[in-house]
Amino acid sequence: MNILLSSTLFVLLMFQIIGSGMGCDMKVRGLDANMKKMILDLHNKKRQIVANGQQSGQPLAANMKELHWDDEIEAIAQRSAETCVFKHTAKSLRKSSKYSYLGENVYKGGYPDPIPRSVNKWYDEVKDVTPAVVKSFSDDGPMIGHYTQMVWANTEALGCGLVTASDGTSYLFCQYGPGGNYPGQQIYKQGPPGSGCKNGKSSKYPGLCN
């Protein structure tokens, strides 16, 4: 075996080791059906609250889509969670067969109940979002990117991965397709809920779009 081939195999092996979460003693790995449903429902309910003008200080949303669960994105997010490192996944690794770029929210905290804690923590950034930022996103100023990715109107797919280490620390990675948070773009179109839907309105979450 030549040196180049040996080096290539070594790099691939190290990538697999890092991606598998070795070095983190995992007590909980992955999400069951109830957990997935909870995460998805929490996201859609938060989006619905904003779209319908029930969030103080936030304008109505005309074109906010209902999110659906994406198994491929879940697998990508799970690999990231299994690194047990509290930092964003490299953008070059955040893509799926359908979406060229996936947004990402990351949470590190105690167990139990990392799901509602994480989603509520991300959403709490709404207090620093102004109507001007909704019209033209900017990441200058207070941290708002977790919230804005949660309610980015064109995002339609969600997948998350979870690891809880033996010390009780949970790592939750949620990825979103297509990703949002593009400077200068609108987070969502302002207007009566559902008035900007291109493929009809959601029957499960009134105010959101299919």
UniProtKB/Swiss-Prot annotation:
GO terms for cellular component: extracellular region. Keywords: Disulfide bond, Secreted, Signal. Contains 3 disulfide bonds. It is found in: Secreted. Its main location: secreted. It comes from the Eukaryota. It comes from Scolopendra dehaani. InterPro entries: Allrgn_V5/Tpx1_CS, CAP_dom, CAP_sf, CRISP-related, V5_allergen-like. Expressed by the venom gland. PANTHER family: CYSTEINE-RICH SECRETORY PROTEIN-RELATED. Pfam families: CAP. Residues 1-23 form the signal peptide. The keyword Secreted applies. Belongs to the CRISP family. Venom allergen 5-like subfamily. This is Scoloptoxin SSD552.
